[in-house]
Curated annotation (Swiss-Prot):
Top-rank taxon, per record: Eukaryota
GO molecular function, one term: zinc ion transmembrane transporter activity
UniProt name for this protein: Zinc transporter ZIP12
Tissue/organ expression: Highly expressed in brain.
Positions of the UniProt region annotated as Disordered: 516-535
Organism field: Xenopus tropicalis (Western clawed frog)
């Protein structure tokens, strides 16, 4: 007796707790403006089971699956009805289909896989349990791929909107939700269940979508498309707000202009405008603008409009730009002509008048600006890291002991320098100078997947320019390798391009290594430093020529000046970023470091290629890196004047293009080696890596956040 009372005492609060949750869920469903409950399928089963006065143990997988099969295979019994029902699925068979043991707990991943199988069962209930089809013996991948291939004319890797419409239509009929008044649209479902609908549903998103559909179906909630008014609604709304039917008068237009001017402060919106409820009937009872509806697929049963829905009551709905365009035109991403703009203007005015869309927000709390100590401390550490990164080019010294390997590795980094220098100028500096490198924040909605090309369209056009440069480089290089003989190539280089070969590159690494000298046969020199006579390969190097090679060539000076300006500008950018916030400064440091390391490594290779010793090249690289500190402190003190930065970027871009395309690229074409095809591969590898690095930086640098 005591145990029975104790059990009853324990059950009463549990019963009332779940009962209260169920009542709250039902009360939320009565308001069509609120999204459904965010609980998953398991939570829905617990709620339904507790409403019947029983308790479901979470660790009993067999009981959970049995209850789920009962609710799915017998939809009439969801709320306690006991109509006769034939079940063909067994709990152990269902668990076997998704690869789960009976003793295992049912977690979210398992319930989502089970939802996929049950959704397939709903779509193929007539054939699922027949002995002919043998569908009960398939594995999970079969059911998943079958749902993705629901329509033969659609992409088999994604579940399109049309296929989702088919699933919703069948599910609505299967669970007999046609007469239910409580419905939620796909947009509300995404918000409530954290479903991202920016792209089509793939095999990763499908299990979550299947769980949501089953959850809402068991809760007697139907899912429809987001409802849109027809094109005439917006004009009719404006006229109705002035109590006009067909004509507006001058005072009405003056009042309209005044309303538009006051929309900056929505709190001052007139009560009359707020109280206007659209009672404008839809033409031909058309509530939804299904401009993209395919012929032969009638889903009118899903979007069945009841008598009270003949009027558009969602006056203050916020429509995205693409949704507004879709209301009027078939292609929401097509350009809008002047005539089409006349049609869409009332919709824009409607959104302004009703203050439907809240001000754009980045969703983050603005932090307090960094203190002076933080700005100078963090920024100094960041530039120090950049300086250390720029010194990585010194690693090329280890290859100077073997002339042939040194030559090959050097050409790899020369190609990397050409790719990073030209890529930095074309993909980063020039767009920034022209003002097209700004970060544009787009709203997230169902068409967001198309933004990837539109947002970075200028980058793909610039990549076309780079493709032209690379294509002609390949033609010239292959012509040199396949057609020109080594002797002709040497004569061409000495006579036309004034590139001298077989001159030594001394690697003075210390007093003990002065005897170990290596010569570079791929030396870049300016016209003033070169003799116009052809130098035979067997000709010994004279001391005068050796001393002359120790001088600093014009190319080395240009690289020093260009790098100094670039690092100076980088320092100003970092100073400006840390003046804004610590997070922005760290993100900018990471972004600059991504292209600074390969850039400086390539520059170090070119400095060695001009005939400088390793020590001098290292010193010049270090001196150019120090200018970042000057730019940093000037940027911190002057808040990095954007006008000054733009001019620095413009001059730097010109220098980078000249260095990479005029001085360095011709050398890559005519350099000779004993292994020409291996060098050709390394040169291409360096070029492509440099361009790819700067392309990825241009696309994703604004997404680096901390």
């Amino acid at each position: 007796m005591f145990k029975w009372k104790k059990s009853l005492f324990w059950r009463i609060p549990v019963f009332f707790t779940f009962g209260a949750l169920f009542v709250c869920a039902e009360s939320r469903h009565k308001d069509n403006k609120q999204p459904p409950s965010q609980g998953g399928l398991l939570q829905a089963l617990y709620s339904l089971n507790s409403a019947n006065g029983t308790f479901l143990h979470k660790n009993n997988s067999t009981d959970i699956i049995s209850l789920l099969l009962e609710k799915v295979e017998c939809p009439k019994n969801v709320h306690g009805k006991q109509d006769p029902c034939t079940q063909c699925l067994r709990p152990d068979a269902l668990l076997f289909m998704v690869g789960i043991n009976k003793s295992s707990d049912i977690d979210d991943d398992a319930i989502q896989k089970i939802s996929v199988v049950l959704l397939f069962y709903i779509m193929n209930q007539k054939d699922f349990c027949t002995s002919i089809s043998n569908l009960t013996k398939m594995d999970y991948k079969f059911y998943r791929n079958s749902l993705l291939k629901l329509r033969k004319d659609e992409d088999c890797h994604y579940l399109s909107l049309n296929e989702i419409d088919d699933i919703l239509s069948v599910s609505k009929q299967y669970f007999q939700l046609l007469e239910e008044k409580q419905c939620t649209d796909v947009i509300s479902m995404e918000d409530a269940f954290a479903m991202v609908g920016s792209t089509a549903v793939d095999e990763i998103k499908l299990p979550r979508l299947a769980e949501i559909i089953l959850t809402l179906s068991l809760q007697r909630v139907c899912i429809t498309r987001k409802q849109f008014p027809n094109a005439e609604f917006f004009t009719d709304f404006i006229f109705q707000s002035f109590n006009r039917t067909n004509d507006l008068y001058a005072p009405d237009i003056a009042e309209l202009i005044g309303e538009l001017k006051a929309t900056g402060d929505c709190s001052k919106l007139s009560n009359r405008r707020k109280s206007v409820r659209s009672v404008i009937p839809q033409k031909d009872n058309e509530l939804l603008s299904n401009t993209n509806e395919e012929k032969g697929h009638d889903h009118s049963d899903i979007y069945e409009v009841e008598a009270h829905s003949r009027y558009w009551h969602q006056t203050h709905s916020c429509f995205s730009v693409y949704e507004l365009v879709k209301v009027f035109f078939k292609n929401s991403h097509s350009p809008v002509s002047k005539e089409q703009f006349k049609q869409i203007s009332p919709a824009i005015i409607h959104q302004l008048l009703t203050c439907s869309c809240p001000p754009a927000s980045n969703g983050t709390t603005r932090l307090a600006p960094p203190t002076t100590l933080e700005k100078y401390g963090y920024s100094t550490i960041s530039v120090l890291l950049l300086t250390i990164g720029s010194m990585f080019g010194a690693t090329l010294i280890i290859f100077s002991s073997c002339e042939e390997n040194y030559k090959l590795i050097l050409q790899l980094f020369v190609g990397l320098a050409v790719g990073t220098l030209s890529g930095d100028a074309l993909l980063h500096l020039i767009p920034q100078v022209l003002g097209v490198h700004e970060v544009v924040t787009h709203e997230h909605h169902m068409q967001q997947g198309d933004y990837i090309f539109e947002e970075n369209e200028y980058l793909w056009k610039i990549m076309g320019m780079i493709g032209g440069i690379y294509g002609f480089f390949l033609i010239n290089k292959l012509f040199f390798l396949l057609v020109s003989s080594p002797k002709q190539g040497l004569s061409l280089m000495n006579g036309h391009l004034t590139h001298s070969h077989d001159l030594p590159l001394d690697a003075h690494l210390g007093d003990q290594s002065r005897k170990a000298k290596s010569s570079s046969t791929i030396q870049l020199r300016s016209p003033d430093d070169c003799e116009h006579s052809e130098v035979p390969e067997t000709l010994p190097v004279r001391p005068k020529a050796r001393r002359k090679s120790k001088g600093i060539s014009l190319l080395a000076i240009m690289i020093l000046v260009g790098d100094s300006l670039h690092n100076f500008a980088d320092g100003m950018v970092i100073g400006s970023a840390f003046s804004s916030s610590t997070e922005t400064g760290i993100a900018s440091t990471v972004a600059i470091l991504c292209h600074e390391i390969p850039h400086e490594m390539g520059d170090f290779a070119v400095l060695l290629n001009t005939g400088l010793s390793a020590k001098i090249a290292f010193l010049m690289n270090f001196i150019s890196a120090l200018t970042a500190f000057a730019g940093l402190y000037i940027g911190l003190s002057l808040s990095a004047n954007p006008d000054v930065q733009i001019w620095i970027f413009a001059v730097t871009a010109g220098m980078f293009l000249y260095l990479s395309l005029v001085e360095m690229l011709p050398e890559m074409i005519h350099v000779q080696t004993q292994r020409p095809w291996l060098m050709f591969f390394l040169q291409n590898l360096g070029l492509l890596l440099g361009w790819l690095c700067l392309l990825l930086l241009a696309i994703y640098e604004h997404k680096i956040q901390f």
